[in-house]
């Protein structure tokens, strides 16, 4: 894997949030799936990590965002973690995968990836977390990839164009969206031959 992406391990991430402004709105849910290579050299989904997040002090939540995501921040079974603890839960799994593949660091894969990375970076800064495994600005964005591969930029339509089922009832769950984005990325990336070691 370390040779496939120049020492970067692709890790698919989705966040659910209290709005669109990473500096102002709360991180509410995060999921991550490091990718693996199977025996045939094809990218496949690894083991997921997932956490609900307690809105950090001083952050805001737009009620319209909760209508879209369906998140009930007061649900008794939400079992949300404080932001620093949630990040560490995700980052520990990512760091372990980076080490296992002898990679230098993780690169975030996402649908509108800079949105997800922006919220991750804002949460890192806010919580004082010192061990962020992700590249600070480089990403693989499935909006661009799906637009080129299938002419589709909306996640649901891109996933269906790639030949997968999309369940609207599960959409806007960070874990479900991460799984679907990961399948989409793998389908597109696996259609290309692996680069030569010199490439």
Go through each PLM region and give its residues.
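Conserved protein kinase catalytic core
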Residues: 20-22, 147, 183
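Substrate-recognition/cap helix-loop segment adjacent to the acidic, metal-dependent catalytic center
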Residues: 117-137
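Active-site-proximal helix-loop-helix substrate-binding element of RNase H-like nuclease domains
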Residues: 53-76, 142-178
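Acidic, Mg2+-coordinating catalytic module of metal-dependent nucleases/exonucleases
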Residues: 107-114, 118-119, 123-124, 156-199
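Acidic active-site catalytic centers that drive phospho-/nucleotidyl reactions
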Residues: 14-16, 116, 141, 177
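Conserved non-catalytic scaffold segment of RNase H-like nuclease domains
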Residues: 2-111, 162
């Amino acid at each position: 894997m370390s040779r496939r992406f120049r020492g970067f391990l692709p890790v698919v991430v989705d966040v659910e949030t209290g709005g669109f402004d990473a500096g102002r709105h709360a991180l509410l849910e995060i999921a991550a799936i490091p990718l693996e290579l199977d025996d045939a050299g094809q990218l496949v989904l690894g083991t997921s990590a997932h956490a609900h997040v307690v809105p950090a002090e001083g952050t805001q939540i737009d009620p319209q965002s909760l209508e879209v995501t369906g998140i009930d921040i007061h649900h008794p079974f939400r079992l949300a973690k404080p932001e620093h603890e949630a990040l560490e839960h995700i980052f520990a799994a990512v760091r372990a995968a980076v080490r296992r593949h002898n990679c230098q660091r993780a690169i975030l894969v996402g649908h509108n990836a800079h949105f997800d990375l922006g919220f991750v970076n804002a949460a890192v800064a806010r919580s004082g977390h010192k061990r962020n495994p992700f590249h600070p600005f480089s990403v693989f964005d499935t909006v661009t990839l799906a637009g080129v591969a299938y002419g589709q930029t909306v996640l649901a339509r891109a996933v269906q164009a790639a030949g997968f089922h999309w369940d609207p009832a599960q959409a806007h769950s960070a874990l479900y969206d991460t799984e679907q984005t990961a399948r989409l990325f793998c389908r597109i990336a696996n259609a290309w031959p692996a680069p030569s070691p010199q490439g």
